[in-house]
């Protein structure tokens, strides 16, 4: 871990983040596993690292002033409060919190056989018990498409055709659930091969009617989501 008590460390990280947004025009930045930094050694029992908390607040406030359209996202699975509250209200100042709980519960539900789902409905409803504590982002990200985890379409229950039907239901649920949406490339046309940074996506599968139809479906519901303020605010 970085020693955020040192000025040179803070300067290096802040300058790097600003450089990525300024020169490469990234849409935003995700800070990975922030609990490892917020708590000493990543252990809540050891208490909060005040140097790190102060650093995150100052960095986020500065980045938002310089890059007001960039999204600053925190990946965190703990209950540390005010992740997305403004710094002025003693928050960390992130725009969104990566909702790992929603992602894991949702994917578990859709890989469960339909006749068993009546015993797992809480996986769809639990997110609303905490959802308004923060501003959440719903992620189907690169993390779920690498290292033998299988792609989103592969995770669905059923045979080849059933997986596409399940995946349509999955995305309709995602797009109508409160929160910002994030969908990793390849998911939108049902790619079965995991992501490989050394290869481009398997665009040729769009010649198959079932993949092409799924791609058009995602395009259509994305348009509906973007055109209706209640679905994307």
Per-range role (PLM):
Residues 1-48:
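Substrate-binding/active-site clefts of carbohydrate-active enzymes
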Residues 2-3, 7-10, 206-216:
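A short, structured beta-strand-centered segment in the mid-to-C-terminal lobe
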Residues 25-27, 39-198, 205, 223-232:
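Conserved alpha/beta catalytic core and glycan-binding cleft of carbohydrate-active enzymes
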Residues 9-20, 55, 59, 167-170, ...:
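Alpha-helical packing segments of well-folded alpha/beta enzyme cores
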């Amino acid at each position: 871990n970085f020693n955020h008590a040192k000025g040179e460390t803070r300067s290096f990280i802040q300058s790097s983040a600003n450089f990525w947004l300024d020169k490469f025009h990234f849409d935003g930045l995700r800070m990975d596993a922030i609990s490892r930094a917020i708590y000493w050694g990543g252990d809540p029992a050891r208490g909060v690292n005040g140097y790190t908390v102060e650093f995150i607040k100052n960095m986020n406030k500065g980045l938002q002033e310089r890059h007001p359209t960039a999204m600053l996202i925190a990946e965190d699975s703990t209950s540390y409060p005010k992740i997305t509250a403004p710094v002025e209200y003693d928050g960390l100042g992130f725009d969104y919190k990566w909702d790992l709980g929603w992602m894991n519960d949702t994917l578990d539900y859709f890989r469960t056989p339909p006749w068993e789902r009546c015993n797992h409905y809480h996986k769809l409803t639990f997110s609303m018990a905490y959802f308004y504590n923060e501003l959440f982002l719903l992620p189907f990200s690169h993390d779920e498409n690498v290292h033998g985890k299988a792609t989103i379409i592969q995770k669905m229950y059923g045979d080849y055709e059933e997986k596409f039907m399940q995946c349509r239901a999955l995305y309709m649920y995602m797009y109508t659930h409160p929160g910002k949406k994030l969908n990793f490339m390849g998911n939108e046309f049902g790619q079965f091969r995991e992501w490989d940074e050394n290869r481009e996506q398997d665009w040729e599968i769009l010649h198959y009617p079932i993949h092409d139809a799924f791609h058009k479906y995602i395009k259509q519901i994305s348009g509906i989501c973007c055109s209706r303020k209640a679905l994307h605010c």
